[in-house]
UniProtKB/Swiss-Prot annotation:
Residues 8-65 form the HTH lysR-type domain. Residues 25-44 bind DNA. Belongs to the LysR transcriptional regulatory family. Keywords: Activator, DNA-binding, Transcription, Transcription regulation. This is Probable hydrogen peroxide-inducible genes activator. Pfam families: HTH_1, LysR_substrate. GO terms for molecular function: DNA binding; DNA-binding transcription factor activity. The gene is oxyR. GO terms for cellular component: protein-DNA complex. Required for the induction the katG gene for catalase. Involved in the response to hydrogen peroxide.
Length: 311
């Protein structure tokens, strides 16, 4: 039976959150700077006080019980609040001085991440980024679970409990095989996609959905190529080999055009494109910090790429 007078300690909740996020005691103990035996004792005391088992222990991996999964978001919120309280009490004036877990979608990472990392290292030397690359849906799931602090994704992201800050817009460019009649054109109508074999990324990539949306808005039904690609770089190589055409974001052009004999064409106005933004948990209490980070990211990317900052 639970002790109705029991009040969980921050140490106990922090231990639970660490074990839940790492899914193992060794990694959680290392992250907290304690021994595994100490961590186990603290977590056991929390479970005893609550009168419920939070995790299932095994020799290789830790699993959350249904009760643990239900209580984890509350524990994460308390730990985040405690950390914010400690930072405020210490008189911190720079909310971006510590570590941050940042997620990015695959069609952003190879093209703008080097610019972002170099700029942050120069402008915010105290901020250490831990980067995770994944598709949008999985990034949002991990973000909601508390294993990420923020993510750079294509908007909109209509997800409960998540706040989005638009950063920049960029055009899509039509990637064509070398020598294609449309290569070099600057006013290709989107309706031209009806007559071209469109090569798409695999299911789950937001760029796939965006390409199909371009066709839909143009009122055409795309002729899909027989080939699909797991990455934009692979898609570009397939296009170079004559297997179809594809859409690439403007930020990808310098990289992809430099390593392949790629034909490129601009769409006629209004040019289709995408909006990239920063998302974070609405409950984090760090809106100002993330808005500052979003502004810095936009400034860095716009200095090196042909994008339009969202005002």
């Amino acid at each position: 039976m639970p002790d109705k007078t029991y009040q969980p300690t921050i140490a106990g909740l922090r231990a639970f959150v660490a074990v839940a996020e790492k899914r193992q005691f060794s990694g959680a103990a290392t992250a907290l700077g304690v021994s595994q035996s100490t961590l186990s004792q603290v977590l056991a005391a929390l479970e005893a006080g609550l009168g419920t088992q939070l995790v299932e222990r095994s020799t290789r991996r830790v699993f959350l019980t249904p009760q643990g999964a239900e209580l984890l978001p509350h524990a994460q919120a308390v730990v985040e609040a405690a950390d914010a309280f400690t930072a405020a009490a210490a008189g911190s004036t720079d909310p971006l001085r510590a570590g941050m877990r940042l997620g990015l979608i695959p069609t952003v990472v190879p093209y703008v991440l080097p610019t972002v990392l170099a700029g942050i290292a120069e402008r915010r030397p105290g901020l250490t980024l831990r980067v995770t690359e994944d598709q949008t849906e999985r990034l949002l799931a991990v973000l909601r679970e508390g294993a990420l602090d923020a993510a750079l994704i294509a908007l909109p992201a209509e997800t409960a409990g998540v706040t989005a800050i638009p950063i920049y817009d960029e055009d899509f460019v039509l990637a064509l095989p070398p020598g294609h009649p449309l290569a070099g054109k600057r006013r290709v109508p989107a309706t031209a996609l009806a007559d071209l074999p469109l090569l798409l990324l695999d299911e789950g990539h937001c760029l796939r959905d965006q390409a199909l949306d371009v066709c839909h808005k143009a009122g055409v039904r795309a002729e899909l190529a027989n080939t699909r690609a797991a990455s934009l770089a692979t898609a570009v190589q397939c296009v170079t080999g004559g297997l179809g055409v594809t859409l690439i974001p403007q930020s990808a052009v310098p990289v992809e055009a430099s390593r392949s004999r790629l034909g490129l064409a601009q769409f006629a106005a209004p040019r289709p494109g995408r909006r990239i933004g920063l998302v974070f948990r609405s409950s984090s209490g760090r809106d100002d910090s993330y808005r500052e980070l979003a502004g810095l990211i936009g400034e860095l990317i716009s200095s090196q790429h042909q994008v339009r900052l969202v005002k």
